[in-house]
């Protein structure tokens, strides 16, 4: 059983439907025991980093997530969920994240329209099994105003939006997707299909 973490913010139903379409055994839960018993964790999210991390802290889920990931359990963060994986965010102040990936979440300060909303193509930087069913330059759907600023060693794919915007990242058993795979058609499903194979092997 793979658990979609319900902390009060997130596109839970659409993420759940996407995984179920791929016949992944998923459950939405906010119970610590379910997270501990899960095969892997899925961290969705829509909204502000500050609100999300406060809800995770208040519910006691922050420490459980860190403990389970430290044991080697896979986690994938989607959209805001990916941003929560980083050390800190500068959205509406300065807030500590889960600290599972080095780097910080910063405002996407570009001359283009912000939020970065709509379809953009992916460029690959590192090979990884999560990319096995897609080709470079396939389009996925983004909605965000902040992005992950890091040394980019964890970046597997990025979108060019005047800046290099990390789109898929990975550090050991921690994966993150900045765009919405559940809204990205066949390309998004193919990414989740590849991730399914990673967590079920």
What is the role of each PLM region?
Residues 47-117:
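Cysteine-nucleophile active-site neighborhood
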Residues 2-24, 181-183:
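N-terminal beta1-alpha1 ligand-phosphate binding loop
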Residues 42-44:
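Structural motif
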Residues 26-37:
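Short acidic low-complexity segments
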């Amino acid at each position: 059983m793979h658990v979609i973490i319900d902390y009060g913010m997130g596109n839970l139903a659409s993420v759940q439907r996407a995984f179920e379409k791929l016949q992944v055994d998923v459950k939405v839960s906010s119970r610590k025991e379910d997270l501990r018993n899960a095969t892997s964790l899925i961290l969705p999210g829509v909204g502000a980093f500050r609100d999300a991390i406060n809800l995770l802290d208040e519910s006691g889920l922050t420490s459980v997530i860190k403990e389970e990931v430290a044991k080697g359990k896979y986690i994938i963060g989607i959209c805001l969920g990916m941003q929560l994986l980083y050390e800190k965010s500068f959205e509406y102040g300065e807030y500590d994240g889960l600290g599972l990936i080095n780097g910080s979440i910063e405002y996407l300060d570009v001359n283009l329209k912000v939020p970065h909303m709509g379809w953009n193509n992916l460029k690959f930087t590192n090979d990884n099994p999560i990319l096995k069913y897609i080709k470079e330059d396939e389009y996925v759907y983004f909605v965000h105003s902040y992005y992950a600023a890091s040394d980019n060693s964890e970046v597997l794919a990025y979108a060019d939006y005047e800046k290099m915007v990390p789109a898929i990242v990975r550090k050991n058993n921690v994966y993150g997707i900045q765009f919405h795979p559940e809204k990205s058609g066949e390309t998004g499903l193919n990414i989740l299909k590849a991730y399914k194979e990673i967590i079920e092997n």
